[in-house]
Amino acid sequence: MERSSTSFNFDKIPKFIMKLYKATNNEKYKGICWTPDGLKIHIYDRDVFVKETLPLISKTREFGTFVRMLNSYGFVKSKDIEEEDIYYNKNFRKGREDLLGFDDSLRMIKRKKSSDIRMRIGDGSLKEIVEYLYVQNQELYTELSVCKERIERQERALNGLIEILSRVFRTNSQDLGARIKPSGHNPHNEMDFFLGELSGPLKEGCEPASPPLQDKGIPELSFKPGGIPHADSDTKDDNYDPFF
């Protein structure tokens, strides 16, 4: 059955969806492609996709934020292979660009209130509610994963900083201990310690090292064989009497 052309509105396609479709179709965009059946998008290399392709699709640089955007536009993660990043939307298919603006399935999904959910359940649209709850669960799971990753990264950084500070403290303590020996007093710094050593009391059993005192008023006598003792002096007094 042919779809009515009035249902198609190309102008209503969000820019995010158009950029995502272009990136999935073109092989030059790395890290993302179609699944073999052309019904789902497959992000086969997350690191390459985040580094090279994601900046061309969205302003975000975090994969978790990108997944939340997919969920907000109605994409659901495939249950076939849980460890693979495969997402699908019924109107996002390879070679079917006309489906992008067919209805509101690729429009931004607003969070529904619990009262709206109860009303829809009463109307019998249980399948839609289950799909909505699944999308919300995926979104919360992604947010939790992002928060966990950030916490682990912060813990690693903090542990590394503590280790560096510990090494610096140990090194400084060893250097300070090698320069300053224990003493009877506790100097505030190395200069106080040095001055205290100079002005401190002498240790027991030690005498000051000083030259012997000599009275300058008494000249030192020297004796020569057969001679008269006389004082060693460079100059002699004319009135000097050796027999006085």
UniProtKB/Swiss-Prot annotation:
SMART domains: HSF (SM00415). The keyword Ribonucleoprotein does not apply. Residues 123-168 are annotated as: Involved in trimerization. Residues 231-244 have a biased composition (Basic and acidic residues). It is found in: Nucleus. Pfam families: HSF_DNA-bind. Gene3D superfamilies: Winged helix-like DNA-binding domain superfamily/Winged helix DNA-binding domain. Its main location: nucleus. This is Heat shock transcription factor. It comes from Encephalitozoon cuniculi (strain GB-M1) (Microsporidian parasite).
